[in-house]
Amino acid sequence: MKPLKILFAGTPDFAARHLQALIDSEHQVIGVYSQPDRPAGRGKKLQASPVKALALEHDIPVYQPVSLRNEDAQAELAALGADIMVVVAYGLILPQVVLDTPRLGCINVHGSILPRWRGAAPIQRALWAGDAATGVTIMQMDIGLDTGDMLLKTHLPIEDRDTSASLYEKLAEQGPSALIQALKGLAEGSLTPEPQDEALANYAEKLSKEEAQLDWRKPAEQLWREVRAFNPWPASHFPHQDAAIKVWQASVSIEAAKQAPGTIIRADKQGIAVATGEGALVLETIQLPGKKAMAVADVLNARGDWFTPGTQLQGVTPADEAQA
């Protein structure tokens, strides 16, 4: 197999792990595209993306156009003479002229089993929906949003204790090896592109802080999924004692909840059981404002008066109540 001349486009840590795999492979990374440096930290100093930092460590030329829609940026990219462009969480739209520039086009690493969960938050939405599995899809990019032909897919069972953070780590391990395997198939001409079935497609909408507020009227099963899906961001939470309480770990209890949704049924070292629309959600690890995340047993030692059985927790905004 003749090594490929690769352009890589990506920005966050997830992308950097794929770039590292390419650097370690027999292929040649001839250039890296990453989003412009952004202000970060308390001093708001400009900070390079993880992808840019890794590229500079290996003396790989870095390009940071604000857009790839202008002709100068497109001409600069074309002049590099890449065989293929690998795109992983880049964050900029690639116009058709860019998709057509490399000899083998552009391929993307997407964090779901396409065509399910196209879009911005596939890992989180798989948890949110209660999917049994997720995975990585390597696809040939076209002008649509994650609509290109699929080249290779991996599968990863979703476990009960998985969160978005843990799935992110698992897929960040699966993705690079899948990418290297797909590049080998493309170089040898042994891959058969598989069109996506539009009837099976759905979209992973971006997450919002508002969506992460717990609504105790929902079934405990759904709230449990949300706690896992929104960990680490935006973190499931509910208002109580004029504070926003974050929930990092919870479980479902089948104990009958005769009380109104949001009522604390019990509070002990096993957790705080809260009545929901169906069953009870047991809060196991929570975080009070200005504090670290703590096991409920430790929280109760310090703030047991906040969580006495019979207490009614908020979790529905007035606007929600008006619509109910």
UniProtKB/Swiss-Prot annotation:
Broad class of enzyme this protein falls into: transferase
InterPro entries: Fmt, Formyl_trans_C, Formyl_trans_C_sf, Formyl_transf_N, Formyl_transf_N_sf, Formyl_transferase-like_C_sf, GART_AS, Met-tRNA-FMT_C
This protein's UniProt keywords: Protein biosynthesis, Transferase
Keyword 4Fe-4S in record: no
Keyword Transferase: yes
Catalysed reactions, as listed in the record: L-methionyl-tRNA(fMet) + (6R)-10-formyltetrahydrofolate = N-formyl-L-methionyl-tRNA(fMet) + (6S)-5,6,7,8-tetrahydrofolate + H(+)
Gene Ontology MF terms: methionyl-tRNA formyltransferase activity
Record-level GO cellular component terms: cytosol
PROSITE patterns for this protein: GART
Pfam families (alphabetical): Formyl_trans_C (PF02911), Formyl_trans_N (PF00551)
Protein residues bound to (6S)-5,6,7,8-tetrahydrofolate: S112, I113, L114, P115
E.C. number: 2.1.2.9
Stated role: Attaches a formyl group to the free amino group of methionyl-tRNA(fMet). The formyl group appears to play a dual role in the initiator identity of N-formylmethionyl-tRNA by promoting its recognition by IF2 and preventing the misappropriation of this tRNA by the elongation apparatus.
Protein family according to the UniProt entry: Belongs to the Fmt family.
Protein name, as recorded: Methionyl-tRNA formyltransferase
Organism in which the protein naturally occurs: Shewanella loihica (strain ATCC BAA-1088 / PV-4)
